[in-house]
UniProtKB/Swiss-Prot annotation:
Family membership: Belongs to the UPF0336 family.
Gene3D superfamilies linked: Hotdog Thioesterase (3.10.129.10)
Pfam families: FAS1_DH_region
InterPro entries per the UniProt record, alphabetical: FAS1-like_DH_region, HadA-like, HotDog_dom_sf, UPF0336/Enoyl-CoA_hydratase
GO molecular function annotations of the record: (3R)-hydroxyacyl-[acyl-carrier-protein] dehydratase activity
CDD domains: R_hydratase_like (cd03441)
Designated name of the protein: UPF0336 protein SACE_6876
MaoC-like domain residues: 8-128
Superkingdom of origin: Bacteria
HAMAP family: UPF0336
Organism: Saccharopolyspora erythraea (strain ATCC 11635 / DSM 40517 / JCM 4748 / NBRC 13426 / NCIMB 8594 / NRRL 2338)
Amino acid sequence: MPLDQSFIGREYPPTPAYEVGREKIREFAEAIKDRSPLHRDPEAAKAAGYPDVIAPPTFAVLLSMKAHDAIVEDPQLGLDYSRVVHGQQEFAHHRPIQAGDRLRTVVHVDDIKARAGNDFLTVRAEITTVEGEPVCTAKSTLVARGTAEDPEGEDA
């Protein structure tokens, strides 16, 4: 079943606050093999001008993917998550994510396109502090395989 095009432009409510801790940053850095002391050593981070350790740039995926739950779990959209693959990811950082941040994410459906029998869902996650300071904009493409109707009646 094709995705509902009327969802283009939809914005979902902010996620609950996510507390960024040093340990979460360290674990993420270890998982992606980023050995920078800025992610592990508060003194190294302070010497570089940061108030505390900073997260690797891709740490934002934790927040953006969690925010995607609002879209994935929206029964009106009709997205069968068992058919979804992650197609693309981009980040635009306004400042580094750092230990002690309390962050919220608002997710938007920016586009839905049908191609070759698949639906391509473009999602934007705006990550801010709980006070509203912009931190990161994450854009993702989710591909729902075999859900779209080919406008020309053929699957390419």
